[in-house]
Amino acid sequence: MNTRATHKTEGFVLKTLSYSDSDLIVTFYTRNFGKLTAIARGARKSRKRFVNVLEPFCCSSLLFSRKQRDQLAWLESCQVINEFPEIRKSLDRTLLASYLIDLVDHFSIEEKPGRELFELLRSFLLLIEEGDTSERLLRFFEIRHLKLTGYAPALDCCMICKAPLNPQQRYVFNIAQGGLHCRSCYTTPAAPDVLPISVGTIKTLLLGREIETEKMKRILFSGQTARESKSLLSLFIGHILGKELKSLKVLDEIQRMGL
């Protein structure tokens, strides 16, 4: 006879979906189980259960049960650890946090443990909560997220000749191949999926990929680096997913409007 096993972990709400008149299906990214989907019984109607704990990017202590690993979990209880109130007061912070959550949701696989990714998301949401909405924060999250999910762009050397990064050389980034070509190797005409990129931008991304989070603000992020890194990472992520995330479209539009 199968009995339900009960588990406890911490998790961020990635998204919710109405399941019935009273229930919700909630997708979390958890510390111990990675991406986890559970049914929250009565969450749509009850004024006592799950009140204000199933909002996007809210971090909570979760208690869930299920009979088998491949079955949908039942959310037994959910207690808030951090609802990030300052993020919710600000449109730009909310949109930025929503994009980070969207990235994690689209790249993560159901119940593939990823404690490092959980900690990455937690640390960057805390930075946004404290008021950091910089281009640097966004790009460094993207490059670290790609590394942890196995999609890190090859930025250490030319993919063709394997020569290490050279300050005297010029480079392009091939979106489809996911890496650098030095100008000595890349001689074909310009193409929409091949982007010129400066050595300064490459070095900044490599440093941002590895540096301790609390030291990120020390890294200079020039206008050129901001433009080049945004084009490279946005197009590369879109290539991997086969689409541009709606959350990024909204974020870009609001930033262009200066709201």
From Swiss-Prot:
UniProt superkingdom: Bacteria
Organism of origin: Syntrophus aciditrophicus (strain SB)
Keyword Cell wall biogenesis/degradation: no
PANTHER family with a match to the protein in the record: DNA REPAIR PROTEIN RECO
Protein name per UniProt: DNA repair protein RecO
GO terms for cellular component: bacterial nucleoid
Function, as annotated: Involved in DNA repair and RecF pathway recombination.
GO terms classed as biological process: DNA recombination; double-strand break repair
Record's keyword terms, sorted: DNA damage, DNA recombination, DNA repair
Similarity field: Belongs to the RecO family.
